[in-house]
């Protein structure tokens, strides 16, 4: 008997259930305690500006072009473009884009910024100001409830309308959920201070001497016993963008780009963007995002470690060759329609990272130094990300809120397609929610491949190498013991309307709200969308997901890059 292809399975389900399913089922919506209003509140305000006024056009000189590009950026009025013509621009030192300026090439692969061998410094190209930094925190008082848009300080704060302020509070390891910077190891860098791992970066609309009104309401209720405080961010860069360009770090990558560095660094930014930028070569992080608010990374192509080959070399080992690394704090950002491949982990999120959307990214063909190990594609890797939405991604690997540096909670995976890579048995779990990963929401996902996964769920049992759809509550990647399993992970997990390969069907949680919305952050099909159906992924779609285009060919929904 021939098998029905996986992606066409919903058609059979619909035919079998015809006549037995009531018309007009209730539409599912995320519980208010597990979500925030992402729609209209992520990415550059009013979307990316279309700037047409050219301040200067530069062409490769044949020598070191860094100073000429920096000079053009320094002289560029706000709202105008520094245009780079076709060819390879050689950079002996880093280039940073400043507020109000767009640095635009002639297209990915047409205009190339190539770092020189021996280049010093923590990045090749950046958006940010060397004056970036945090001021001393000001204690907050009064009610600070989720959804509120006003905060009150215990003393005059000195803030101005338009300032960026980081709101946080002390960790609460015994709380519900637990918030802790202690996991397998102890983190000291995932917030303003080691014991302040949960928070929100906000923009101020209005101020008095001791109050401030927020552009986006609070994602979380901050409580007085945990001493909430707010610290202004200085040296913020706003309204800057990089477009239509390739940044090649293949020769210039070095350990100087570790930690807060990267091939491209966005640091202390608001309403900034990368659009149609190719990044070749990640020493540790291809794109490093630090203290970012309402910024967008869209339609970029990010790939290869340093050196690019061999695929199983040490350059793809621990602490090497990440894609986009978001830490230690960032809020209301949008990471959309990017193609990230031949790297260890396409997305890592760590610290007080809240209210962001990672959506419609294509994450195939990960590399790792251990050829049998299944690495993380989208990972929460440090305390304490909350209220982030992971929607519509097409990935090969493992989705993992891990416990390496501590806790995370209240993040949502909606309408994603994930499968395990072929021929690997190390860490063979599609969704690996480890110790301290509480109140996760997984709805409308298409998980696994028929004949690959052997069991539905592993929780509180000794492991024997089983391939599973879910692994819940284990202490670390290498933990295979039932002892010490965190039962709170499964007890607080909301799963609804996910198709998985073990059941070969959609599993509902018993409620009647079985009509899934197309998106949790978009009102409709976005302007950059290609020919793929909308929405593209879900157990209610026929087929359940679009064809895999293969690496280097765009995303499944926008083959030309968006």
Language-model features, listed with the residues they occupy:
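Predominantly extracellular beta-rich ligand-binding scaffolds that present long acidic/polar faces
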Residues: 98-100, 119-120, 398, 402-495
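Extracellular beta-strand/beta-solenoid scaffold signature
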Residues: 118-133, 223-233, 255-265, 281-285, ...
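Extracellular "leader-to-stem" segments immediately downstream of a signal peptide or signal-anchor
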Residues: 2, 7, 11-253, 260, ...
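A conserved hydrophobic secondary-structure block that centers on an alpha-helix together
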Residues: 165, 172, 269-273, 282-284
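Short, T/G/N/S-enriched strand-turn elements that build extracellular solenoid repeat scaffolds
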Residues: 69-76, 90-103, 113-114, 285-290, ...
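Short, solvent-exposed linear motifs at loop/edge-of-secondary-structure regions
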Residues: 156-169, 195-203, 236-248, 378-397, ...
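Right-handed parallel beta-helix
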Residues: 100, 238-249, 270-281, 293-307, ...
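Ligand-binding pocket scaffold of soluble enzyme catalytic domains
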Residues: 38, 77, 104, 115-116, ...
């Amino acid at each position: 008997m021939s098998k029905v292809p996986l992606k066409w399975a919903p058609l059979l389900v619909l035919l079998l259930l015809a006549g037995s399913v009531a018309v007009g089922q209730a539409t599912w919506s995320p519980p208010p305690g597990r979500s925030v209003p992402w729609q209209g509140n992520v990415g550059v305000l009013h979307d990316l500006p279309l700037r047409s006024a050219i301040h200067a056009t530069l062409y490769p000189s044949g020598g070191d072009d860094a100073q000429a590009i920096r000079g053009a950026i320094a002289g560029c009025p706000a709202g105008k473009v520094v245009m780079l013509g076709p060819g390879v621009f050689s950079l002996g030192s880093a280039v940073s884009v400043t507020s109000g300026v767009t640095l635009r090439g002639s297209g990915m692969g047409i205009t190339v910024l190539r770092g020189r061998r021996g280049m010093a410094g923590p990045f090749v190209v950046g958006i940010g100001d060397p004056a970036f930094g945090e001021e001393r925190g000001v204690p907050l008082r009064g009610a600070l409830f989720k959804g509120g848009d006003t905060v009150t300080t215990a003393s005059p704060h000195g803030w101005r309308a338009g300032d960026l302020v980081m709101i946080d509070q002390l960790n609460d390891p015994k709380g519900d959920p637990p918030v802790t910077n202690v996991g397998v190891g102890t983190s000291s860098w995932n917030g303003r201070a080691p014991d302040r791992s949960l928070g929100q970066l906000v923009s101020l609309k209005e101020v008095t001497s001791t109050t401030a009104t927020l552009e986006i309401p609070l994602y979380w209720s901050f409580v007085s016993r945990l001493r909430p405080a707010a610290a202004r961010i200085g040296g913020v860069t706003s309204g800057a963008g990089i477009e239509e360009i390739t940044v090649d770090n293949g020769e210039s990558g070095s350990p100087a780009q570790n930690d807060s560095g990267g091939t491209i660094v966005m640091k202390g930014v608001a309403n900034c963007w990368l659009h149609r930028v190719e990044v070749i070569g990640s020493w540790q992080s291809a794109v490093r995002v630090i203290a970012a608010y309402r910024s967008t990374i869209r339609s970029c192509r990010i790939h290869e470690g340093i050196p690019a080959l061999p695929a199983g070399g040490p350059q793809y080992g621990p602490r090497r060759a990440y894609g986009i690394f978001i830490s230690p704090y960032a809020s209301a950002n949008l990471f959309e329609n990017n193609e990230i491949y031949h790297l260890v982990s396409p997305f890592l999120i760590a610290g007080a990272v809240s209210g962001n959307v990672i959506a419609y990214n294509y994450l195939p063909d990960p590399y790792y130094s251990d050829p049998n190990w299944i690495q993380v594609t989208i990972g929460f890797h440090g305390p304490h990300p909350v209220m982030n939405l992971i929607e519509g991604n097409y990935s090969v690997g493992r989705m993992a809120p891990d416990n390496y540096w501590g806790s995370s909670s209240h993040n949502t995976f909606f309408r994603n397609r994930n499968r395990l890579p072929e021929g690997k048995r190390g860490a063979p779990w599609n969704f690996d929610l480890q110790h301290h990963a509480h109140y996760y929401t997984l709805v409308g996902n298409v998980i696994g491949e028929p004949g690959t996964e052997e069991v539905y769920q592993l929780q509180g049992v000794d492991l024997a190498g089983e391939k599973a759809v879910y692994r819940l509550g284990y202490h670390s990647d290498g933990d295979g013991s039932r002892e010490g399993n965190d039962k709170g992970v499964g007890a607080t997990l909301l799963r609804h309307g996910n198709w998985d390969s073990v059941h070969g069907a959609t599993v509902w949680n018993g409620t009647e709200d079985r009509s899934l919305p197309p998106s949790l952050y978009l009102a409709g099909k976005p302007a950059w969308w290609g020919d793929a159906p909308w929405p593209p992924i879900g157990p209610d779609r026929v087929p359940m997901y679009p064809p895999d285009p293969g690496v280097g060919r765009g995303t499944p929904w926008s083959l030309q890059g968006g």
